[in-house]
Amino acid sequence: MSTNKKVQSPKEESIAKMLICKVHIGTKNLENKMKRYVYTRAKDGVHILNLAKTYEKLQLAARIIVAINNPADVVVVSARPFGSRAVLKFAQYTGAQAIAGRWTPGMLTNQIIQKFTEPRLLIVTDPRTDAQPVKESAYANIPVIALCDSDSPLEHVDIAIPCNNKGKESIALMYWLLAQEVLYLKGTLPRSKPWNVMVDMFLWRDPEQFELKNLAIEETAPAAPHLTENQFATEAPYEEWNKKEEWNDNANEEWKNPIAAEEW
C-alpha cells in the first residue's frame, strides 16, 4: 500500500491555510464593486469570497511592494486592534513603517505637523476603519493596497485584496503571507525552504488574557511559609539581662581624657 502524500503547490498550501483561518468568510452586506471577488452566498446570507482571486491579488501586491527601492517608503496602517500586532511584525520583517492605532490627521497632507511623512505606498487593514489615511492618500497621490471584505468601500483603493479583515486569525495570516512573498521576491528567503516564522507571531493577543493568566499562576503557586511572631523575635541570653554595670567615675575614666590631635 502506497503511503506517498501528494505534495501541495505553494498556491494550494496558501489557500489551505486561508480556509483554516477563515479568510473566505465575508459579511452579509455586499459592496457593488466587491461582487467580482465573491464566489457564492451561503444559506445564512454570508458571502463567501473567492480565495483564488485572493491569492492572485496577494501576489500582485507583493510585487508592487518589492518594486519600491526603499522599504521605509512603505507605510502599513491598522486602526483595528486585531491588526496592530500584524502590521508591526510585517514592518519588522520587510523594513516598512508601521502605524498601529489612531491615525493622526494630516500625516500625509499637513507639512507643519511633526509626524508628517511622504510614503510611496500605503497599505491599510480596513478601508472603512482606516478611512482617514485612505482619503489623505488620494490628496497626496499615493497608491493604496487594502485588505477588503465584502462590504468594504473601494473608493481611492488601487489594489483590493479580498479577505476577511475582521478576524484576528485572518488578518494575521494575510500579513504573514504578504511578508513571506515579499521576502521570496527580494531573494532574502529561498522558495525551497519554508519560512521559520510562525503565523502565531502575527496574531493579536489580548493584554487582559495575560493578566488573567498571571493571576491564575499566582493562585496556583505554593504559598510562602508563614512565620510566627516568636520566630521573628530574638531574645538576649539571660546573663545579659541581669548583668550589672558600673556608672561611677571609674567606669567613665576613658571619656574624661581629651583626644589627642594625632588620633584625629
From Swiss-Prot:
GO molecular function: structural constituent of ribosome
UniProt keyword annotation of Metal-binding present: no
Gene3D superfamilies (UniProt xref): Glucose-6-phosphate isomerase like protein, domain 1
Disulfide bonds: none
Family annotation (PROSITE patterns): RIBOSOMAL_S2_1 (PS00962), RIBOSOMAL_S2_2 (PS00963)
Chief location of this protein within or outside the cell: cytoplasm
PANTHER family noted in UniProt: 40S RIBOSOMAL PROTEIN SA
Protein name from the UniProt record: Small ribosomal subunit protein uS2
Organism: Plasmodium knowlesi (strain H)
